[in-house]
Amino acid sequence: MSLIQEFKAFASRGNVIDMAVGIIIGAAFGKIVSSFVGDVIMPPIGLILGGVDFSDLAVTLKAAEGSTPAVVIAYGKFIQTIIDFLIISFAIFMGLKAINTLKRKQEEEATPAGPTKDQELLTEIRDLLKSQQGK
């Protein structure tokens, strides 16, 4: 099998395609969450904390000199990134929890019930016939 044929077989597997779709949707979801945090969540929090804009929070290590930009630690952006992460993690957790609940329900439905009355009766008849043959 040539390298190209092997790659086609690999890429056409369902799991690889599902993973690719998941990555694309995840990237789009990440942008939505970042916008939600930066544009919806952080402004009211900043207002409550006295008009603080978290994206501007930084510690200047070295001031700008001429054309050389300042050296800063932008911890406000880091705080926003942490909140993004927490929201995305919670959304993924809730999604997985829902999927696991559905899987459990399907497994419970697939579990066969005990023997039916007909099966129990046939088992009793079989046992009686075996006991009569043994006499």
Swiss-Prot record:
Annotated Gene Ontology cellular component terms: plasma membrane
Coiled-coil regions, chain positions: none
Membrane topology term: Multi-pass membrane protein
Main localization (coarse): membrane
GO MF annotation: an example: mechanosensitive monoatomic ion channel activity
Tagged with keyword Protease: no
Segments crossing the lipid bilayer: 9-29, 79-99
Pfam families assigned: MscL (PF01741)
Location in the cell: Cell inner membrane
Disulfide bonds: none
Assigned keywords, A-Z: Cell inner membrane, Cell membrane, Ion channel, Ion transport, Membrane, Transmembrane, Transmembrane helix, Transport
Entry's family note: Belongs to the MscL family.
HAMAP family on file: MscL (MF_00115)
Subunit structure: Homopentamer.
Protein name, UniProt field: Large-conductance mechanosensitive channel
